[in-house]
């Protein structure tokens, strides 16, 4: 039998990225936190679903806080110190995710709301009658 050399998978190298951008997408059902460098390369990401929450609990502020802490911990390992925060969406986890990033040890230099607003584009879904 021929011997085969064992090939290990390509592991992400540790980069020293001192400052970056945190994108927080907060919907009513989930919160996604992506941390990128200034050119847009994703360094770490996390979401409420990836943090172990399922169903309706993904939309809670605590789930957003947990997701932000996990993403921040991975970014700190890459050497990140200063961040700009771009928040998108109407969800309940916006403020708690920002607070969790601050508590994790990242210095926030800018917070910007980039929620897309239509200039009367598509028709809205009909109102729920409960």
UniProtKB/Swiss-Prot annotation:
Keywords: Ribonucleoprotein, Ribosomal protein, RNA-binding, rRNA-binding. One of its GO terms (biological process) is translation. Pfam families: Ribosomal_S11. GO terms for cellular component: ribonucleoprotein complex; ribosome. The keyword ATP-binding does not apply. Belongs to the universal ribosomal protein uS11 family. Part of the 30S ribosomal subunit. Interacts with proteins S7 and S18. Binds to IF-3. Located on the platform of the 30S subunit, it bridges several disparate RNA helices of the 16S rRNA. Forms part of the Shine-Dalgarno cleft in the 70S ribosome. This is Small ribosomal subunit protein uS11. It comes from Prochlorococcus marinus (strain NATL2A).
């Amino acid at each position: 039998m021929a011997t085969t050399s064992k090939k290990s998978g390509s592991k992400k190298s540790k980069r020293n990225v001192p400052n970056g951008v945190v994108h927080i997408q907060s919907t009513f059902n989930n919160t996604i936190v992506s941390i990128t460098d200034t050119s847009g390369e994703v360094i770490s990401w996390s979401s409420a679903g990836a943090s172990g929450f399922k169903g309706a609990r993904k939309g809670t502020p605590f789930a957003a806080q947990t997701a932000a802490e996990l993403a921040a911990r991975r970014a700190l390992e890459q050497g990140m110190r200063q961040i700009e925060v771009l928040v998108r969406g109407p969800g309940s986890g916006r403020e708690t995710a920002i607070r969790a990033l601050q508590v994790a040890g990242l210095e926030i230099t800018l917070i910007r709301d980039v929620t897309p607003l239509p200039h009367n584009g598509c028709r809205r879904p009909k109102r729920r009658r409960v």
